[in-house]
């Protein structure tokens, strides 16, 4: 279990480029610094649903699985040199640049149904859509 964290720490210092096979091939559940992680490769349709729900159209990211921080469940991914989480409702959190120091302090502004919801005055805007929540079913 510690090896996945060590792998992520190494990738933070080097590069996440083309690393999908080096992270995990099986589902790994761990608790680390008050957060619950499930590292695995989600189904493509699940990834598309969550990323499009947060209007994240980015081809240079690595989906790591899911994370729960303060009872908030999110899909966890690495993009633009930082860890991010996106909820089933499309709210995007920039969690931090180190797996050891993730927090919910920075939320990205989302645009839902033409109304802007301002989260911590962060100046990125994404158009969001609502989807039902099947990502966090335990049978994945």
Swiss-Prot record:
Highest taxon listed in the record's lineage: Viruses
Family that this chain belongs to: Belongs to the orthopoxvirus OPG159 protein family.
Record's protein name: Protein OPG159
């Amino acid at each position: 279990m510690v090896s996945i964290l060590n792998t992520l720490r190494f990738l933070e210092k080097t590069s996440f480029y083309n690393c999908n096979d080096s992270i995990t091939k099986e589902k790994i559940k761990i608790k680390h610094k008050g957060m619950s992680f499930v590292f695995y490769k989600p189904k493509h349709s699940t990834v598309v649903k969550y990323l499009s729900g947060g209007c994240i159209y980015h081809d240079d990211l690595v989906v790591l699985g899911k994370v729960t921080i303060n009872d908030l469940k999110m899909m966890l991914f690495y993009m633009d040199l930082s860890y991010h989480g996106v909820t089933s409702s499309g709210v995007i959190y920039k969690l931090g640049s180190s797996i050891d120091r993730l927090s919910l302090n920075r939320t990205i502004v989302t645009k839902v149904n033409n109304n802007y919801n301002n989260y911590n005055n962060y100046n990125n805007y994404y158009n969001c859509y609502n989807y039902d929540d099947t990502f966090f079913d335990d049978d994945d």
